[in-house]
Amino acid sequence: MSIRLKVANTAKELDDVFKLRHEVFIQERGKFSSKDIDPLRIVDHFDTLPDVANVVAYEDNKAIAAMRINRDSQIGLPAEEYFDFSDIRSHLKQKYLDSKGQGPNIVSASMLAIHKDWRNKKNVIFSLFKTAAGVMYSWDATHVVAAISEETLSLYGRIGFEVIDKPMWSESVGDTLLPILAPFNKVFDWTFGSINTKVSHFWLDNFCSEFERLILSPGEVIFSQYEPARHAYAVDNGWVSISRRDPESNEMLLANLSKGALFGEVAIFNGESRDATATALMNTELIVIERSHMLDIIRQNPDKLDQLLGHFARRIRETDNLAMVLAFAPQTGRVEVALSRLWDSATPDRRKPKTRVAKVGPQQLAKTAQVRETEVRRVLEMKKAKGCLNYGDNVVRFLRPPKTGDFTEALKESPV
């Protein structure tokens, strides 16, 4: 079943967040010793401030994880209830005034609550952090502070946080806490670094705070042909197939999309139903943009239309080039193009960073290139013999970048 992450906006969603905190912190973990706590919810005065956002993850209709983000205010940040950040604040303020002529914009992360059934599933935890980072980006954050449980330090360390003082036992929380700090550019690079070069800044700059996220298992349908269009999507991790059925129910694969690919946005603007079906091919994480948010931004900022037209111009050019490949390229050329696109979306091997790995096999490549699987295997065997790659039934390991022929190189330039 899919998991959806979003910023809580309704009374019901906020109540789900407050109840989840109580379930996790008090019922499951025995934290927060105060007798004054609500018997069903955990809420404090930082939840009442103007610049606060709560990110919540849902499986079906059940809240399974949540995190709060606060923008700096006259009463400080939640982390400062437990630690003195005044020296850090003074240092950052002087540094930013000297270099930029204005002070830093500090935000705080707090109240990380994850249901026990999901606590060891890092895809949910990291997706929660990524959704929160989208809000921080829209707030022009420069630094993030937090007071965290000592046992969660390894999670925050991966994102770019560093410990800035000794741990301290908090009687009111019933836990050992650590003060941590991260420059937001590190958090942003962790969140959007690899996708930032593939998705137009039009989407990041205008919709970042409205991004939802969707975590899918293999075979889950994102949307179906003929259904109304309510969202646009970008692939953050994984693969998505786009297919269409004709009146006789014959299925045609239109594309396999990987990291950085934007899809579903055309139907958002023309108001028509979907003309294809989108399906997750493997464990996949998507960034989701709701139709009403997108249209509101365009109505409020007509100057954004230039950026939007630029995006659609690039999409048309890519479609023209792909049509040229499918119409005129020999089967070998089609496989070369498919491999080139696969290289762009493959991820570096952790042990050998110069090697890239894509969890896609010959059968899926054949569907993408619209050729026989035997032809794909023939090309793969030739490249394997030359030391370019290794492959299996469900994986391709690139040992070096693929070289494309003159035909595919020519397609990089649009004829119009």
Where are these regions (language model features)?
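Short amphipathic alpha-helix that is part of the acyltransferase structural core
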Residues: 1-43, 49-58, 63-64, 198-203, ...
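Short, His- and charge-rich active-site/binding loops that engage polyanionic ligands
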Residues: 56, 60-92
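Acyl-donor binding region in acyl/amide transferases
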Residues: 79-163, 167, 174-181
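Ligand-binding loop in jelly-roll beta-barrel domains
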Residues: 102-103, 269-292
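A small-molecule sensor/coupling module
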Residues: 128, 273-275, 293-333
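Phosphate-/nucleic-acid-contacting segments
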Residues: 142, 147-149, 157-183, 187, ...
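Regulatory nucleotide-sensing modules
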Residues: 196-248
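Short acidic-glycine-tyrosine-enriched beta hairpin
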Residues: 248-263
